[in-house]
């Protein structure tokens, strides 16, 4: 089985080479030699050791993206086959400057020098539709069918980035989708003098992979975010289904070969999109398609705030994804029938558990869709998962008690200890060996040295040295003297 991780945020930083070298155990004194060799080979942005780039990860791809990067590193190290899917954004969130004590955001052109670790795969591009209309018909066997006729299309071109495991021969893959136009230039519009119209489709399609987190304070911004979400989940699902087709595996066996993790609600449109493909394209029955869908997906929730749980307006979904809205309505109708059967007469419970918020501004609760369409739901910690069951999804926990579990998120020690603090990592290895790099639970053996004065002295020396380095950097970049005793 292949683990598949859907994550809209950017998931790897520009210091990918440094991460890779850390996995290969290239030590700090040798990094400067590697840096010179990389620059000689023309590797863009290869700055290592003391010249290592100092960029805030959150300003580039978001916390969820950083978490996804840790998962991919861990999966590769555990030698578990996995693919991480996302969007190949042309711009990050922003580059941060501090002027007169205030944050100033400037365009983050992180791809301006190219990215040597990615491999374009244009022969594996996918077509994605938006808007349009639906029409119903009867197939050759007299079954009721629906056909979606989009009026807008984009092409998703995959770019693959290798993710190497630590001290193993496993290489997993990050596949990022770049948006291209199906028609890049309209000669007719150009010839009649409509120069903007001649490239309108190209600009509109390529906007899908321009920037992470477009401003959703406007109708156009919200529409772009929705289209981004559908774009990358549609491309990713098509890619998975294509891999089965190439091996002659029937779509009914999809969950036996792909386990899809929804990292928060941003990829939840994958549920109606997979249903659409299975029903409308592969022509499965609803029951077979739904059992396949639920067996495929698992959902990780990242927030306990009800107001922060993602919702999309029905009006917007109807304009951008009309067929998907129909499928969501059908999922909701069938689900509420089950709730009604188990809790007859409890109208308030039906209202609370419905996927659709009724009223003047009707909307779809994406978190409810994720819970109903997945076979497993977890929070990011033991406490978080318990609060989900007792508060946020209490009704769903009563209805699907076997569906909720506590699976704690974590970080990779290779990135956040061995690479981030090499002197401390070396000190730990000196006393307990290097097994902790693959098994973080081995750090517990440090408790045996809790009263070891020699280790305590060396530990404090490492901390002091790191403070000196930070104070020097602040002085070099900002001209501000800082006492290390204040850190």
Please give the residue ranges for each predicted region.
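A conserved ligand/cofactor-binding region detector
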Residues: 1-6, 10, 23, 35-36, ...
